[in-house]
Amino acid sequence: MADDGLLLNFAIPDTTVLRPEKTKVKGGTWRDRLSAKKIAAHRTNNPRKEKSASNGEQNSNPRNPNRIQVSGPRPVKRQRIEDDDGNGGSQPRQQQQQHPGAPRQFVSSLFSKNPRPRNAVEEKNEAGAEVEDAKPTNAPLIDGLDTFTNLGLSAPLAAHLLTKLEVKAPTAIQKASITQLLKEESDAFIQAETGSGKTMAYLLPLVQRIMTISLNQKKREEGEQVQRDSGLFAIVLAPTRELCKQIAVVLEGLLRCAHWIVAGTVIGGEKKKSEKARLRKGLNILVATPGRLADHLENTQALDVSNVRWLVLDEGDRLMELGFEKELAGIIQKLDARQRPSRIPGIPAKRTTILCSATLKMTVQKLGEISLKDAVHIQADPADEDGEPRKKDEDDAFRVPAQLKQSYAIVASKLRLVTLTAFMKRTFMRKGSVMKAIIFVSCADSVDFHFEVFTRKNGDEEEKKEESEDSDEEDAEEKRKKLGASAHGTIAPATAFSNPSNPVALHRLHGSLPQHVRTATLGAFARNREPSVLICTDVASRGLDLPNVDLVVEYDPAFSAEDHLHRIGRTARLGRDGRALIFLMPGCEEGYVDILKKGYRDGGKALTRNSADDILKRGFGGNVESQNVDWEEKATEWQLDVERWALENKNYLEMARRAYQSHIRAYATHIANERSMFNIKELHLGHLAKSFALRDRPSKINVPGLRQAQADTKKDFKADRKPVAGKKRKAGGHDDDDDDVPRQTDTLTAAQKMRAKMKEHMAGASEFNLA
């Protein structure tokens, strides 16, 4: 009987078995003892978790249920299991042992855990409604009575427009401005929608007035007319170098009928020595950026502005946004102080200032107060545009051309890169469907990254190239020339969305490129007659008239509604059709659709919505129903291929990280009125990193330094060449004392650190390089 009682005592449940653990906890602080007791109690209440040991130990040493286990003074911590793939808890530790010190990478799925759009059903029904094609609002006038000769232009100039420039009729804004500027000498404010011909609207009256002065002088004094040394009569100011170049090209085309009138440019990025030589020879019309003109007015004695009678401020709102208010005020003050009565007959007694802007914002009104006096507001006649009366509220509004077809796509942040690729694949699938397209992104680093992604070569292509490198070298050079490959690295074949029947050339443009590279790239894109794409920042969003642009893609939304309207204004110009697509993310960004609708006179009835899944199906799956099954696999395979490409090369990986960080900084610079729709706190940084081909956690994405501006690079170069103060150089060019080299290096390092610190306080605004 006693033995039976002992057996019953040993068969008592586990609570009595683990009781001795309470008495065995000794040593340490009271916090350690308390935590050890809690762990022991937790293990007692959850006996199943005791089986988390390896399978090998369980099979070799079966546990004895009658054995009493006594824990040590400190209980052993349980291993944290982070197993997303279901392959066991030992896999993460094995990966860490294989790659010691490397940041942990995570390969997530493209089509899992993506947020859904908020208003999917309502917008889909609205997009399904049929809308009639709108009548173009910025096309040349059809009425035969509205010719250039009837507006007051001379017969030679009108004939030159018709025969050489193939401009048959004026637009509505050209009709209103030419009539006003030729009739009166008062200041004027020209306001018109994008793509309506504002450049010709103020250039034609200027050229006509100077031609009239020259003709009158020739009649009075035989054999003499206006020459390049007669004086500077007109100055045109533009915010960007590209716009100045374009204005100069248009002006040069107009002056072919009056070769005695000479025009020139002074812009940033060019050699001041060459500009001073042109100014010494003499110019009649000068196109300039505000900063460079202010510099020449201060330092160049050959620049005589005493005869300037016309001053044009093109894109006035952009001039103020880029911070040229101080320079403009100084230029106007110097022009007023240096103005003198002219000896040439026919020149007006006072200066006429013309301000051109698409909007009447507060900054434009402030610029008008600085430069204009009793100005006349010139707008296109509503009857000339669409025959409908304009409401009072719409007088000052900046509208989109009616023939422009705007659409938007709600795309999750993880799917942005593959969706853009699929859309471009579908766009250039057939030859001749789209000739030219522009992709707008937020910052220069993002331009460089996407350019490398879209022009990279696949593995199969690289193998074929290595095999036939020697035999087909000449053929490859011919193909590069056909596609316009550039020695500057800004033009390359777009392998991501090209096909054998329709090759596409990709161009990149941003403000960090040298000026001659920017000019060459923009000229190559404009002259290219083959399908081509330009990926750029807002440096190409204002005033540029690029021919045959059929499509504008806003991959990153603009920083303001006005910038958005200027971006999409690169297409649908002078009555031509055009399309525009903007990428928005699910959530708060969907509220931006209401702003898109405000840009249309009809309230955005023609605004359509594209589904991200439909874009991916058409780009990676095709039209056949059987092919639509594996479009997700093809999209995933393409994304993983890009990620592997970035991981294999440190330069590409650093480029992706720079683009990711610059994109986040640019995202935080939206104007205050739209910041609720572009809230940086709502961004899923991990999903966003996926769209930049990154597998690292957002907290582990670090970049050694920011992009250096051009000015900083020049300063560093000059500082390296300067000798140390107080030391003489030998004949060979070396310093007498070798100890000066570390001292100079320390000075340069301190200067670089100071510049980096200043850039951090400036919130990274310098890397956008818009001007």
Swiss-Prot record:
GO terms for molecular function: ATP binding; ATP hydrolysis activity; RNA binding; RNA helicase activity. Keywords: ATP-binding, Helicase, Hydrolase, Nucleotide-binding, Nucleus, Ribosome biogenesis, RNA-binding, rRNA processing. Its EC number is 3.6.4.13. Residues 23-35, 119-135, 712-723 have a biased composition (Basic and acidic residues). Residues 90-105 have a biased composition (Low complexity). ATP binds at residues 192-199. A motif (Q motif) lies at residues 146-175. A motif (DEAD box) lies at residues 314-317. Residues 23-139, 458-485, 703-771 are annotated as: Disordered. CDD domains: DEADc_DDX31, SF2_C_DEAD. Residues 179-378 form the Helicase ATP-binding domain. GO terms for biological process: endonucleolytic cleavage in ITS1 upstream of 5.8S rRNA from tricistronic rRNA transcript (SSU-rRNA, 5.8S rRNA, LSU-rRNA). It is found in: Nucleus, Nucleolus. It comes from the Eukaryota. Residues 403-615 form the Helicase C-terminal domain. InterPro entries: DEAD/DEAH_box_helicase_dom, Helicase_ATP-bd, Helicase_C-like, P-loop_NTPase, SPB4-like_CTE. One of its GO terms (cellular component) is nucleolus. It catalyses: ATP + H2O = ADP + phosphate + H(+). Residues 460-476 have a biased composition (Acidic residues). Disulfide bonds: none annotated. Residues 53-69 have a biased composition (Polar residues). Belongs to the DEAD box helicase family. DDX31/DBP7 subfamily. Present with 1460 molecules/cell in log phase SD medium. The Q motif is unique to and characteristic of the DEAD box family of RNA helicases and controls ATP binding and hydrolysis. This is ATP-dependent RNA helicase dbp7. The lineage of its organism: Eukaryota, Fungi, Dikarya, Ascomycota, Pezizomycotina.
